[in-house]
Amino acid sequence: MTHTETLMNRYNPLGDLVRRIQSHGGFVNSHAHFDRAYTITPKMMERTQDHLFEKWEYVDNFKRNASVGDYFENIKAAIETQLFLTTRAACTFVDIDPICEYNAITAAKIAQEHFGDEFPLIIACQTLKGVLEPEPKRLIENAMDDFQILGGLPAKDKGREEEHIDQLMLWAKDTGKRVHVHVDQLNHPSEKETELLARKTIEHGLEGKVTAVHSLSLAAHPKSYREEVYKICQDANLSFVCCPSAWIDHPRREDLVPSHNALTPVDELVERGLTVALGSDNICDVYKPFCDGDMINELRLLIDGCKIYDPDELLNIVVYNGYEVIGLADRLEDLSVF
């Protein structure tokens, strides 16, 4: 027996887990931005060190010139790669704003129809220009039938974050759509958006319909505060999406905070019975030029970053919880389980 054959016959927990995930239908990528996938260029690499907020504006250069066809090719390439990497469904945020107007959402709808049941694609509106100013608000409202999930980014309506979330919740109550909101992305204790989102979920009676995407800054707070927020999240039945490789690159700071990795505190969330799913976030763009969307990489980083070694819990996170948070829970009974 060769050395390679000997190694292949040994127990490999990651390989065993991946095979099990595949037997349960494959990975679910619960948060991505396929419309911007593979847009990185050598020139853009100069801007990859910019602050997140600066990148929000920088991508206007691409959006302003991208046609429906350009967007479709990005989304199609991303989905084909996801299929190759054994991901079987995804939720992609898609820009709808005065810069790109409806080009990205039109392309996403074409891709949705093109792949059909081969790759169920759930579309969420990305609100990079906020939801409160008249023009962005009008564009989103007029496209309400074209996407399945209301996406939010409260930081884009700075100083009016509560109003931003209120508007999302009002739309959700009118349409019955789920809500996914980017919160606490700066890994800093000055942010308390997860708490705000949970409280607003309860206030609007949308328990079980809202998902917090990222919630990094939660881990930067003292344990007493985290425990308080977890209780509110339980009352709100708030779910979460963790995108490990998207945020592990947060720069070092001199702030004194509890020791933690720059990851969603998934270990603490699951211990308290909160639903957590996994996503890739950006793929080969100015935000994450080296991220390829491979969910096995995301799984590995989650396992080691949060020290979650329970294969049953990990299976739930990458498959079952994924279908639940992107609104495809009805597909769970169709999965082939062994």
Please identify what each model-predicted range represents.
Residues 28-35, 182-184, 214, 281:
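Histidine-centered divalent metal-coordination motifs
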Residues 40-93, 99-116, 141-142:
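Alpha-helical scaffold segments that flank or form the walls of functional sites
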Residues 37-71, 175, 193-211, 236-240, ...:
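Active-site gating loops and adjacent loop-to-helix segments of metal-dependent hydrolytic enzymes
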Residues 12, 104-113, 133-239, 256-278, ...:
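Histidine/acidic residue-rich metal-binding segments in metalloenzymes
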Residues 14, 57-73, 122-134, 153-158:
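Active-site mouth loops of central-metabolism enzymes
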Residues 199-210, 246, 250, 260-338:
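His/Asp/Glu-enriched, well-ordered alpha-helical/loop segment
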Residues 96-98, 125-131, 156-158, 185-189, ...:
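Active-site-proximal loop/turn and secondary-structure-junction residues that shape catalytic pockets
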